[in-house]
Design a protein with these regions (language model features):
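Solenoid-repeat scaffolds in large eukaryotic assemblies
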Residues: 166, 235-236
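Glycine-rich helix-loop "coupling/hinge" segments at transmembrane-helix boundaries
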Residues: 205-231
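Outer-membrane beta-barrel domain signature
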Residues: 167, 246-266
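A short amphipathic helical element positioned immediately N-terminal to and/or at the very start
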Residues: 32-40, 177-178, 311-317
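Flexible interhelical linker loops that connect adjacent transmembrane helices
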Residues: 257-288
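Short helix-to-coil transition segments within interhelical loops
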Residues: 158-185, 229, 317
């Protein structure tokens, strides 16, 4: 009886996955010559190149910026404030992408916070924030906290005995960093990179809003344009399959090298990093944690500030907002229940 139930559930969810593909293939007409011409088109080449380029840069910058932040947090992970920061690092899963877009404009735009106080546009000879600069900033703000959480996860899996041995052998700070902590980060670096690369490669709202024109269009945006405006489902589906293939390729290679670790076990009350009490290390860690926390969580801070300062909360109590809120609540709760049961 148990196995019959399992097969029934598997069959049901298999249908849910396969039926959309049946609908997709019913819309496409395969013509090898047209497919060949489409992939030989210079516009298609530019779409593929820019999609890979912006995703690669975004993922690389997010990962490299996350490493010093994760290392600083790991050295003081027994503090309650660090646990709170680590919890906040998962906000990329719950914050709407459009809020990141608004935050980039409010903070880095022509009339934004940084330009108003530091006159960045004139000092750095910047004409506009829109384009590759805005896309990279938005992806960094969205994905660096996520990368920090994953790298912290890797560091958190280092056995306490390793630190005790390191301390007893009087290994230097850089020796400890290069021989113990960096290898643990390195073993999952490409996995984290591949996840963030896929997220940036599939990015839609950020590229659509901050791209600034067709020059900075990606495959995801082109699929939307072909399907909605040109009603050319052949091109949209071809690009979709190309996108799926590229993402699966990176994810397969990334997860092939994945090493397991303790994702939620942050509590190590007796944890004492061998070098955390050094005055210079304390100052550097403090500056890193404060700077990265302010910069990476600036979208949340910006949204809350404008929400309260402009009295937006007063306009939310209306029929339209409440209807949208309850629709979202019903969909999310129902989806959560179905996924949990399955």
């Amino acid at each position: 009886m148990y196995y019959k139930y399992n097969y029934s559930v598997l069959f049901f969810f298999g249908l849910i996955i396969l039926l959309p593909f049946v609908g997709i293939f019913s819309k496409i007409t395969f013509d090898l010559e047209n497919i060949y011409n489409f992939f030989q088109n210079s516009y298609t080449h530019r779409l593929i190149y820019f999609s890979l380029y912006q995703a690669f840069l975004s993922a690389l910058l997010s990962c490299f910026l996350a490493i010093p932040f994760a290392l600083a947090l790991n050295r003081h992970k027994n503090l309650k404030i660090i646990k709170f920061i680590i919890s906040l690092c998962g906000f990329c899963f719950v914050i709407p992408t459009i809020l990141i877009v608004f935050a980039v404009i409010k903070l880095f735009g022509n009339n934004g916070f940084y330009n108003s106080y530091f006159n960045l546009y004139e000092n750095l000879s910047i004409e506009t924030i829109f384009g590759i600069k805005a896309i990279l900033i938005a992806h960094i703000l969205l994905n660096t906290p996520f990368a920090t959480r994953l790298f912290f996860q890797s560091l958190n899996s280092i056995p306490l005995k390793y630190y005790e041995i390191s301390s007893s052998l009087n290994i230097t700070f850089f020796g400890n960093l290069l021989k113990l902590e960096i290898p643990y980060i390195r073993q999952n670096f490409f996995t984290v990179f591949s996840i963030i690369f896929s997220l940036c490669f599939l990015s839609f709202a950020i590229v659509m809003a901050l791209g600034g024109g067709p020059m900075y269009s990606t495959i995801e945006v082109a699929i939307y344009q072909y399907a909605l405006f040109e009603l050319n489902f052949n091109k949209a589906i071809l690009l979709s399959f190309l996108q799926i293939f590229i993402c699966l390729f990176f994810l397969f290679i990334g997860f092939y090298k994945l090493k397991g670790s303790n994702f939620f076990e942050i509590d190590q009350i007796n944890f004492i990093h061998p070098h955390k009490e050094y005055k210079a290390i304390k100052i550097i860690d403090f500056l890193i944690i404060v700077f990265f926390s302010i910069f990476l969580f600036s979208p949340i801070i910006s949204v809350i500030y404008h929400f309260i300062n402009n009295g937006i909360y007063l306009s939310l109590i209306n029929e339209k907002f409440l209807g949208s809120f309850f629709n979202s609540l019903i969909i999310s709760v129902t989806t959560g229940i179905i996924v949990s049961i399955s």
